[in-house]
Amino acid sequence: MSCSGVVSLRAQSGSEHPAIDEAAKVDSTQGQEINGNSGYAVRRGTNEFGVWGGGSFQATTVFGGLHEDEARGRKFIIAAFRYGRTLAANDSMALQYTLDVVPLAVATNNITQQTTLITPTGSITTFRREATYGGGLTPLGLQLDFRNSARVKPFVHINAGGLLFAKPVPLPDAGKFAFTLEGGTGVRIFTSLRRALTLGVRLHHISNGNLSGSNRGLNQFIFYAGFSAFK
């Protein structure tokens, strides 16, 4: 009878609080989901608020545009505020609309004056160069993130907008307003569930769309970094 009582007591002890045990299991599972990869996934309707900045070390002529002598010595600095909204998402990918407000764009060694001298042996062209400041808006942007559930997310993007400079860019007769077209890639590294660092490179193209004068575009690879918060 004593043995029977011990067995009965153990059985009662094991099933005394089944609801509490189940709740503990649920809490544990939810904690694993938050602390695991799935907690880093962005969902449809998620908003991004961020800032980024970067620059290029040298303009490129690989894709046409400026001549070698016109592109020489040029650098470009840019800083922007970012708003993004996730349009569609699953565990593998996320598609986002992006808008960038650009308060600062600096084209260094920009050609502001061009002089050509005719000599008996040919012609000599000289340039006057200076830093030219501007700003603008990039309202048309799409970004596709991969590995949406992971903490580190590779992405590709394409953007279009415009910049207004204090002087014509990239040539003296090109006009102060320029259209921009960008395409690039990078990674987002989430430092917490709602904050991320961004590292990337983008091909940045500037041209006036044949609105005035010369339409030889300025092309450059911009390396940049940024920080974003998601809500």
What does each model-found stretch correspond to?
Residues V62-E70, V106-A131, F165-D173, S212-S214:
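Flexible, solvent-exposed loop segments that connect beta-strands
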Residues S56-Q58, V102-T108, G161-F165, H204-N208:
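Structural signature of outer-membrane beta-barrel domains
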Residues V51, G55, A79-R85, T138-F146, ...:
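Residues on the lipid-exposed face of transmembrane beta-strands in outer-membrane beta-barrel proteins
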Residues N47-G53, I77, M93-V101, P154-A160, ...:
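Transmembrane beta-strands of outer-membrane beta-barrel proteins
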